């Protein structure tokens, strides 16, 4: 196969591992900076142009789109889709996953358990907004945040009120969410490829830190999922339309609840903690869907 990894930085662990996995299986793999691509859109011919040359003959792409570059990145993915190129994650699914509110709405529609969440534009009645999620302590999240940035734990009503007023004053869109205290600053990352959960880790925040993101200094260890956790992870990825996804769960007193569905989950933390060749599993997924196995299988 001829595969393009859409990434702005070829030195990133995830990008390097995907490149190595593809090449080890005999495929022709390129790292393409999607921000340097431009698109030719006509009724006669659709093209993606990179460094002055039309990108032709690709069988598949693996999008690794940065959160702050979602609009342009998904436009490039969509252009490849129009050219008939298979994508590990569809452009629409990536867009859904990046819109935290839309993502939660889609999950709720499928009956998937979530923390009680509230979203509002008119914030004069802050007391009612806070009470909607059960009062303080509660979590306030910027819709545009990622990797734990823009997430605040408000432990008292007064702190919650102050943060909401500050975000409102900045015209920022934010969610107010129930705080799952019993999770103890830990979450579960389930890595979904195709229709399977191939690996899972428990991420624990540093002492005094409720955010468990590895980017915030958290630690990770391999865990075994319950059948319920495995099912909810697969259902969540399917609800958003993702084929490669990191589904983040919290273990609450009433069962697992979904916090987020990530369309470009990092590979380093989960591969290091579990020993699972996640990169190779993603390449195998492309092979399965395109009917083109490793080069050795075709010689």
From Swiss-Prot:
It is an enzyme of class 6 (ligase). Binds 2 magnesium or manganese ions per subunit. It holds the Pfam family Rimk_N. Keywords: ATP-binding, Ligase, Magnesium, Manganese, Metal-binding, Nucleotide-binding, Protein biosynthesis. Mn(2+) 2 binds at residues 260, 262. Residues 104-287 form the ATP-grasp domain. Mg(2+) 2 binds at residues 260, 262. The keyword Nucleotide-binding applies. One of its GO terms (biological process) is translation. ATP binds at residues 141, 178-179, 187, 211-213. InterPro entries: ATP-grasp, ATP-grasp_RimK-type, ATP_grasp_subdomain_1, RimK, Rimk_N, Rp_bS6_RimK/Lys_biosynth_LsyX. PROSITE patterns: ATP_GRASP. Mn(2+) 1 binds at residues 248, 260. Its EC number is 6.3.2.-. One of its GO terms (molecular function) is metal ion binding. Mg(2+) 1 binds at residues 248, 260. The keyword Manganese applies. PANTHER family: RIBOSOMAL PROTEIN BS6--L-GLUTAMATE LIGASE, RIBOSOMAL PROTEIN S6 MODIFICATION PROTEIN. Belongs to the RimK family. This is Probable alpha-L-glutamate ligase. It comes from Trichodesmium erythraeum (strain IMS101). The lineage of its organism: Bacteria, Bacillati, Cyanobacteriota, Cyanophyceae, Oscillatoriophycideae. The gene is rimK.
């Amino acid at each position: 196969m001829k595969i393009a990894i859409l990434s702005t930085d070829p030195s990133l662990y995830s990008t390097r591992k995907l490149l190595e996995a593809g090449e080890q299986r005999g495929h022709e793999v390129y790292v393409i900076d999607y921000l340097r691509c431009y698109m030719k859109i006509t009724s006669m011919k659709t093209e993606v142009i990179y460094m002055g040359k039309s990108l032709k003959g690709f069988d598949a792409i693996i999008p690794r789109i940065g959160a702050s570059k979602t609009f342009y990145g998904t436009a490039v993915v969509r252009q490849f889709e129009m050219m008939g190129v298979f994508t590990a994650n569809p452009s629409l699914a990536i867009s859904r996953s990046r819109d935290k509110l839309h993502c939660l709405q889609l999950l709720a529609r499928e009956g998937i358990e979530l923390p009680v969440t509230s979203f509002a534009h008119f914030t004069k009645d802050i007391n009612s907004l806070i009470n909607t999620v059960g009062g303080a302590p509660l979590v306030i999240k910027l819709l545009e945040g990622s990797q734990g940035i823009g997430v605040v734990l408000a432990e008292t009503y007064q702190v919650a009120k102050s943060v909401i007023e500050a975000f409102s004053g900045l015209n920022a869109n934010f969610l107010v969410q129930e705080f799952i205290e019993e999770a103890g600053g830990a979450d579960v990352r389930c890595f979904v490829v195709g229709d399977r959960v191939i690996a899972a880790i428990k991420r624990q925040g540093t002492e005094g830190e409720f955010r468990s993101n590895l980017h915030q200094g958290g630690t990770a260890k391999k865990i075994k999922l319950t059948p319920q956790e495995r099912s909810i992870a697969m259902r969540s990825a399917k609800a958003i339309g993702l084929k490669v996804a990191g589904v983040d769960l919290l273990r609450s007193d009433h069962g697992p609840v979904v916090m987020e569905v990530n369309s470009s989950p990092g590979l380093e933390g989960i591969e290091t903690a579990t020993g699972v060749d996640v990169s190779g599993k993603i390449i195998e997924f492309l092979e399965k869907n395109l009917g083109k196995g490793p080069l050795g299988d075709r010689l």
